[in-house]
Amino acid sequence: MQKTSIPDFQITAKVVYVPSESRPDEGYHFFAYKITITNTGSTPAQLMSRHWVITDALGKKEEVRGPGVVGLQPKIQPGQTFEYDSACPLTTSTGSMVGRYFFVGESGESFSVEVPEFYLIAPLALH
């Protein structure tokens, strides 16, 4: 009997509002975020592409698809963490992002991992 190893990943996001890059009076809010991807499984896998759905406070959705992340297609070994920084402008002071990363495992199998929804909230939106 052959045992199959299913890759397992934990993904977290940290968001920061960037006031120096934002122009709230003009409807431009700039958010920076750091994504941490940890391979908690027992097999390596390579991140091949991404798909994001970005939603603003008015319900307007924008989809972003592309190869890798920040120009890279990292191979993430078991126990290894890969982090990257990116950014997202919005026309509203709040919004959210949710997505999916598409990987290829060491045996050539393709699979995807959901990026849990995270929120983009300008400090001024809380007052």
UniProtKB/Swiss-Prot annotation:
It holds the Pfam family DUF525. SUPFAM superfamilies: ApaG-like. InterPro entries: ApaG-like, ApaG_domain, ApaG_sf, Uncharacterised_ApaG. It comes from the Bacteria. Residues 3-127 form the ApaG domain. This is Protein ApaG. It comes from Bdellovibrio bacteriovorus (strain ATCC 15356 / DSM 50701 / NCIMB 9529 / HD100). The lineage of its organism: Bacteria, Pseudomonadati, Bdellovibrionota, Bdellovibrionia, Bdellovibrionales.
